[in-house]
């Protein structure tokens, strides 16, 4: 067969693909929704942890930023 790829190679490729999808899509999307819910009520330590995760997941945040747009909530006057 021309496409006789060893099982170990397929396993490693699947592992790399799943880790990259998790790092670039799943974790940043979860962080976006968490930040949207907790931004105005977070304590100082929680805000520091949020800033760390934004720094850590920055490539995924850049990848998702054109599609997710969370504007501030409308104020009741």
Swiss-Prot record:
Membrane topology value: Multi-pass membrane protein
Keywords: Membrane, NAD, NADP, Plastoquinone, Quinone, Thylakoid, Translocase, Transmembrane, Transmembrane helix, Transport
Record-level Gene Ontology MF annotations: oxidoreductase activity, acting on NAD(P)H, quinone or similar compound as acceptor; quinone binding
This protein's GO CC annotations: plasma membrane-derived thylakoid membrane
Main location, first listed in the record: membrane
Transmembrane regions: 10-30, 48-68
Pfam families cross-referenced by the UniProt entry: NdhL (PF10716)
Catalytic reactions on record: a plastoquinone + NADH + (n+1) H(+)(in) = a plastoquinol + NAD(+) + n H(+)(out); a plastoquinone + NADPH + (n+1) H(+)(in) = a plastoquinol + NADP(+) + n H(+)(out)
Disulfide linkage: none
KW Translocase (keyword) present: yes
Source taxon at top rank: Bacteria
Subcellular location, record wording: Cellular thylakoid membrane
Enzyme class: translocase
InterPro entries reported in the protein's UniProt record: NADH-quinone_OxRdatse_su_L
EC number(s) recorded for this UniProt protein: 7.1.1.-
Function description: NDH-1 shuttles electrons from an unknown electron donor, via FMN and iron-sulfur (Fe-S) centers, to quinones in the respiratory and/or the photosynthetic chain. The immediate electron acceptor for the enzyme in this species is believed to be plastoquinone. Couples the redox reaction to proton translocation, and thus conserves the redox energy in a proton gradient. Cyanobacterial NDH-1 also plays a role in inorganic carbon-concentration.
Subunit structure: NDH-1 can be composed of about 15 different subunits; different subcomplexes with different compositions have been identified which probably have different functions.
Family: Belongs to the complex I NdhL subunit family.
Protein name (Swiss-Prot/TrEMBL): NAD(P)H-quinone oxidoreductase subunit L
Species assigned in the record: Picosynechococcus sp. (strain ATCC 27264 / PCC 7002 / PR-6) (Agmenellum quadruplicatum)
